[in-house]
Amino acid sequence: MGIILSIIFVICILVVYDLCLSKYGLVCTDYTVKNSKIHTEIRIAQLTDLHNSIFGEDNKRLIKKVADQNPDMICITGDLLNMDINNVNIALNLISGLSKSCPVFISLGNHEMNYRYSDLNELIKKFEQAGATVLNFEFQDLKIKGETIRIGGLYGYNLQTANEACHDDEVEFLSNFQN
């Protein structure tokens, strides 16, 4: 009986450790994507599903970790907020801190789309005032290091891969994005 309780205790400790690591740990993963149309290295930092997480006072650990990667642009791809927490200041301070080193672009996720404490247009305005460009069903052509690249924001939670399964506006957006 004592061995079983010890094993259960160790498993509980490991689960708590893993949960803390996933909530408060910062991990950078590098990916190299080659494109025949781009001849210069462009570094993009991509953040997603932060859900109002805080990494150090005023998110300084996260801001430093991103800045240390020396990105040319930062893309936040949804769920910067937690839809049921009435505190947008965590996100605004993060955007403000990140935007000091390079441009920040945001594509909205379901937590922004369904945020309970603010109208969507007001939320977008706050993100933009903090220093981000919000791409909500739109795209933008950018010049970075002499290269023209197109980025866009499309909210399509569980977006289907087959055109016939997508909404007409999503198909139109993706078609225009490719051109």
Task: State where each predicted segment sits.
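A short linear-motif detector with a strong N-terminal bias
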Residues: 6-13, 23-25, 84, 112, ...
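Membrane-embedded segments
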Residues: 40-136, 140
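Conserved catalytic scaffold of divalent metal-dependent phosphoesterases
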Residues: 37, 52, 112-179
